[in-house]
């Protein structure tokens, strides 16, 4: 093996042999066992002879739908592939979350969902998509998974509406937010700064609905970091 990406762990073995009393003392268990954990999609990678989870047939069909909607080619550019994979992963996760009763919001699990959808929308923007499109991928996600998760089909229209509404809401602010982000970024760079202020990150969140991890990703693309501690403090005020 190596520390590179050449190999993927398909499963692992956990040897349950000792009991930890919480104070650093270990004693042997009377009953020992070996626990095996295996990732289903990682197993599919090995069985199908593909390079990654994103190349497994059921996942690739979702990516193919994304490429059809965006016009982007998969496998030609690392940067493009990252965006396609982010969109594929996030819309799949979002579909299941909404089916399970989660709605986009600014707190708790609803905020996780909002962050997923808005990050995916931003990557669509990077691929040149200027209008809502994620909702059109929902049907493919459902088609690939309804055999084992039949309730997805029952809630298909509802899931699609939720995704489309969230996309449309973000679309109203993303262009203005990107413009302000560019201006704020230029100000930091003009001063030779490498840290994007928490106050500016909060402004993007509070005014334009940019989740902190979305801002952090955009800042990282520019070789900078975000003062997330200052952002968190402003969130608490």
Regions found by a protein language model. Give the residues of each.
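A glycine- and charged-residue-rich anion-binding loop/surface
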Residues: 1-237
